[in-house]
């Protein structure tokens, strides 16, 4: 809990974790949208990235899409490979956790026609 005292957390999110990648909302939504389109569904995308839940393998993808959690670096590398993008290109859109807000996520979802994922 020392992180809360020292200011290294933003709403429970560590400011820096090398294994977690926070992407800007506008880029994150587009990236996941392309992944969903290529895979065919959010659950199929979850399976492509290695999520193995039998009930809802797309749950973690949804959490990342909505900005509730960061991309684990290993899953982001799989996403880059799946979409045929260089990981360096994706990492150029890395941001700090506090820059990922509900407002920026809602705006990005609306601009990309993903109203069905709108957070309430």
Q: What does each model-identified segment do?
A:
Residues 39-44, 56, 71-74:
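Residue-level signal for the short linker/turn that defines the boundary of a DNA-recognition helix
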């Amino acid at each position: 809990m020392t992180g809360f005292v020292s200011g290294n957390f933003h709403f429970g999110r560590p400011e820096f974790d090398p294994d977690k990648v926070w992407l800007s909302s506008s880029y994150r939504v587009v990236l996941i949208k392309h992944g969903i389109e290529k895979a065919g569904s959010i659950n199929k995308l979850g399976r492509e990235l290695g999520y193995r839940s039998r009930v809802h393998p797309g749950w973690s993808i949804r959490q990342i899409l909505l900005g509730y959690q960061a991309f684990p670096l290993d899953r982001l590398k799989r996403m880059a490979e799946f979409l045929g993008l260089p990981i360096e290109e994706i990492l150029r859109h890395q941001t700090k956790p506090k820059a990922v807000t509900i407002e920026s996520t809602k705006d990005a979802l609306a601009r990309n026609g993903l109203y069905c994922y709108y957070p309430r």
